[in-house]
Amino acid sequence: VATVDCSDYPRPDCTLEYMPLCGSDNKTYGNKCNFCNAVVDSNGTLTLSHFGKC
């Protein structure tokens, strides 16, 4: 199972760096920052499906 450490989040500003991750909601997030902010917003219900686009 792929995991991402989101302990440093949320962060107010994410870079535009493109390193896509696919969430358990079947949505592609542009980078770890965007994904981790969404994880925090979901109260931990969102998880990483896999690295790369969904």
Swiss-Prot record:
Cysteines paired by S-S bonds: C6-C36, C14-C33, C22-C54
Keyword Acyltransferase appears in the UniProt entry: no
Domain of life per record: Eukaryota
PANTHER family linked to this entry: SERINE PROTEASE INHIBITOR KAZAL-TYPE 7 (PTHR47499:SF1), SERINE PROTEASE INHIBITOR KAZAL-TYPE 7 SPINK7 (PTHR47499)
Carbohydrate attachment residues: N43
Keyword line: Disulfide bond, Glycoprotein, Protease inhibitor, Repeat, Secreted, Serine protease inhibitor
Protein name as it appears in the record: Ovomucoid
Subcellular location, principal: secreted
GO molecular function, one term: serine-type endopeptidase inhibitor activity
